[in-house]
Each structure stands twice: as structure tokens, then as C-alpha cells.
């Protein structure tokens, strides 16, 4: 069986251009070093070319997009959830209970949009292909702040996306650890602590090769409490788990009557991937860490939001275009409006 997020997954091919760290790309794409008056032929050609690029990347809503919006089925009022509403114009409705008017996009992340929904397609494709927000914004001719704002919207749509995921059958399970920010790093005698320490953030990862979970443990080291909290509602009773010899996993085995197969680090160290019994979960660790490295300054307080995004990227549908359409579908049906000023009060990433 092909690995989850397997070798054909586009994220494994990250070009050098997505590792840019150039201060000059932070300026607006249309911030030219010359004014609009008395341009030389070269300046005029240069300016018009960039304006054409920008216009191509910032289209107005197409007829297809308008048709799509008009095709959305309204099930209830986005304000009070009442099913008592009437049509009040072309794709405009009025609720009989709360007396408020709304459209198919009201209270979604596309509410009051200034950029067409179609612009999201490229943004999401870049995000799912492990681009950083900085390089994606540059490629899309958008301000970097727009990329950060849209990422926050993605987080809102995906909140709780893993809540109902339950793994069964043979499950590969292991914790993954990510570093805390430098300002919170604990040192001893001027040196960082080694191994699994308070300088790490734990994420519980498990997969049955068809689907997976990425749940923040809330601890630096596994405990009985954190293990049960992390995996307890996501593993079907009676399943088989293949894991390392972490002692806290025993509580999970006992509570859910699991069949336990364990391998110590000494048994797996140095093994080729195909020979390592924990490779299915190790592969997910590697992909998740690779994605996070592209967003190195991410806010650790929102780590579960990042893990929800990782989960969405590495789980079905495996086709990236289908994944984009799946996200749009979820976003349209989710009453989660995100206001720019409120969301940008705090930086989530760079």
C-alpha cells in the first residue's frame, strides 16, 4: 500500500525558490522606484508589464464564480440557524426569526471578500505543496499580510476537523516533538537540554495507513493523562497498535483492550525505511516537520491549528485539486467569518 502522503506527493519536491529569505521581496509588487510622470520607454514597459501581471493575478469575479455562488443551497440562517427564511432578491435571503438579511457567503470566510474566491485556488495549492506564506504571496502578487490573513481563515475553517476521526485495524503510533521558540528555551550551564525535554512540544501521531491523526499532547513528555487525552477518543477498541516502548501507552492499551506490539529504539535504529516497523508513522513525522520548517516562525500557541492543517494536507482526498475543492466546500458550509482587524492583532506566522 502506498504511504499516506506518499512518494508521489508534491510536497516532497520543494524547490530552492521556496526557501527565499530576501528582504527585498517584502516590498509591494507595485512599489516602483519611479513615479507616474514622464516615464522613459524602458520604465513604461517595465511598469505596464508588472501591472499586467498584477491584473492577471487579481481578477474580478468571473461568470463561473457568480454561477457557483448562485448554485449554493441555503439550509438555514447563518446568524441564528433558523430554517424559516424567505428569498429576498437574487441569492439574497431574509430570516423570519431574527429578521436579518444574508447571502450564500454571509458569515463564511468569503464574506465581504475583496478578492474573488477563485484566487483561493492558487493560494491553497501553494499551501498544500508546502510553500511558505512569504513565497506564496510573492508568487500570487499578494501582500504578505493577505497571506497571513488567509492562513488564519484556513485555521478557522479546519478547527475541530479531527474531532470525529477514529482509527481502527492496525495502527502505528508515536509522538513527534517540535522545538519551542528561542525565548522559551530552557538551558543548563548555558547549553540546551538534550533529548525529550521541556524545550519540546509534543504531538501525538497515529495512522492506520488510510487516515491519521495529529493531536497536540500539551506536554513535553508523555504521561498517562496526556496519552489518554490525546489518543483515547481516536482509536477504536480492540485495535492493534504498533509503537515504541513508551510506558504511558500501557494505559491506552488497557483502557481500549488493544493488542500491543512494541519495538524499542535499539531495535529500529539504523534500519532502512522499508524494514522499520514504525516507518508509516515516522514518514508522517518527517512530512509534518518539513511543512513546519517552511513556517519556522509559527506561533506555538496555535500549534493545534497547524496540526489540523497538516492533517488536512496528508489525509484523503490525495489529489491536490480535489483537496482544494474539498476545502472550499467545507468553508462555504462553515459559519466562520474572520474579520481582518481582529485576526491580525496577533501574528501567527511570517
Residues covered by each model-derived region:
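Residue-level recognition of single "structural anchor" positions
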Residues: 2-350
Amino acid at each position: 500500500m502506498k504511504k499516506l502522503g506518499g512518494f508521489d506527493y508534491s510536497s516532497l519536491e520543494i524547490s530552492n525558490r521556496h526557501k527565499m529569505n530576501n528582504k527585498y521581496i517584502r516590498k509591494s509588487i507595485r512599489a516602483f522606484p519611479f513615479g507616474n510622470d514622464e516615464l522613459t520607454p524602458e520604465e513604461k514597459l517595465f511598469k505596464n508589464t508588472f501591472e499586467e501581471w498584477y491584473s492577471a493575478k487579481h481578477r474580478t469575479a468571473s461568470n463561473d464564480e457568480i454561477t457557483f455562488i448562485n448554485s449554493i443551497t441555503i439550509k438555514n440562517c447563518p446568524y441564528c440557524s433558523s430554517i424559516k427564511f424567505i428569498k429576498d432578491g437574487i441569492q439574497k435571503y431574509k430570516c423570519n426569526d431574527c429578521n436579518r438579511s444574508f447571502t450564500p457567503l454571509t458569515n463564511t470566510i468569503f464574506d465581504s471578500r475583496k478578492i474573488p474566491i477563485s484566487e483561493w485556488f492558487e493560494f491553497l495549492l501553494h499551501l498544500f505543496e508546502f510553500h511558505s506564506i512569504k513565497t506564496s504571496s510573492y508568487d500570487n502578487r499578494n501582500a504578505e499580510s493577505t497571506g497571513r490573513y488567509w492562513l488564519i481563515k484556513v485555521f478557522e475553517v479546519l478547527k475541530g476537523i479531527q474531532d470525529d476521526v477514529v482509527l481502527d485495524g492496525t495502527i502505528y503510533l508515536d509522538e513527534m516533538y517540535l522545538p519551542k521558540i528561542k525565548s522559551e528555551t530552557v538551558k543548563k550551564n548555558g547549553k540546551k537540554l538534550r533529548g525529550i525535554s521541556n524545550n519540546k512540544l509534543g504531538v501525538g501521531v497515529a495512522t492506520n495507513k488510510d487516515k491519521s491523526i495529529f493531536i497536540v499532547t500539551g506536554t513535553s513528555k508523555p504521561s498517562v493523562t496526556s496519552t489518554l487525552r490525546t489518543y483515547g477518543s481516536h482509536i477504536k477498541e480492540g485495535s492493534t497498535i504498533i509503537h515504541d516502548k513508551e510506558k504511558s501507552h500501557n494505559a491506552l492499551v488497557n483502557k481500549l483492550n488493544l493488542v500491543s506490539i512494541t519495538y524499542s529504539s535499539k531495535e529500529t535504529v539504523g534500519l532502512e525505511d522499508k524494514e522499520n516497523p514504525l516507518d508509516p508513522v515516522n514518514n508522517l513525522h518527517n512530512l509534518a516537520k518539513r511543512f513546519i520548517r517552511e513556517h519556522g516562525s509559527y506561533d506555538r500557541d496555535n500549534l493545534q491549528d497547524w496540526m489540523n492543517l497538516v492533517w488536512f494536507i496528508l489525509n484523503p482526498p490525495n489529489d491536490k485539486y480535489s483537496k482544494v475543492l474539498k476545502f472550499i466546500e467545507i468553508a462555504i458550509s462553515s459559519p466562520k467569518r474572520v474579520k481582518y482587524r481582529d485576526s491580525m492583532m496577533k501574528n501567527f506566522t511570517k
